[in-house]
Amino acid sequence: MARVKRAVNARKNHKKVLKLAKGYYGGKSKLFKTANESVIRALRNAYVGRRLKKRDYRRLWIARINAATRMNGLSYSRFMNGMKLAGVDINRKMLSEIAINDPKAFADLVELAKKHLNA
């Protein structure tokens, strides 16, 4: 069987990994083996982080909406139920923005939800 020489491919792979590891501390930016381990871990953490970010933002929006609705005399879950009954389809991100930037408009939304809960 013929001997496989991987000089070009190995050099290309090493350069790619070391480029990704640029800025890492010590041997993690200089030595291929440790750099490769660090890069694999970093890419995995970045992948997981992108998914966790979505959860974190949703929790933040809900906490903001809950705080604003309680200031207007209603709980978050009853507010969302009232909004659904009223046929208002505004997502949580926009509701939290309204709660922060326009409290008067948000108070009107809470009143609308209360009206549909009692009806």
UniProtKB/Swiss-Prot annotation:
User: Keywords assigned by UniProt?
Assistant: Ribonucleoprotein, Ribosomal protein, RNA-binding, rRNA-binding
Q: List the disulfide bonds.
A: none
Question: A Pfam family for this UniProt protein?
Answer: Ribosomal_L20
GO cellular component assignments:
ribonucleoprotein complex; ribosome
The domain of life for this entry's organism is: Bacteria
Q: Which GO MF term does the entry hold, naming one?
A: rRNA binding
**Entries under InterPro entries matching the protein:** Ribosomal_bL20, RIBOSOMAL_L20_CS, Ribosomal_protein_bL20_C
Query: Record keywords: Electron transport included?
Result: no
One GO BP annotation is:
ribosomal large subunit assembly
**Annotated transmembrane regions:** none
Q: Which family does it belong to?
A: Belongs to the bacterial ribosomal protein bL20 family.
Q: What does this protein do?
A: Binds directly to 23S ribosomal RNA and is necessary for the in vitro assembly process of the 50S ribosomal subunit. It is not involved in the protein synthesizing functions of that subunit.
Q: Tell me which HAMAP family the record gives.
A: Ribosomal_bL20
Entry protein name: Large ribosomal subunit protein bL20
Give the source species: Clostridium perfringens (strain 13 / Type A)
**Lineage of the species this protein comes from:** Bacteria, Bacillati, Bacillota, Clostridia, Eubacteriales
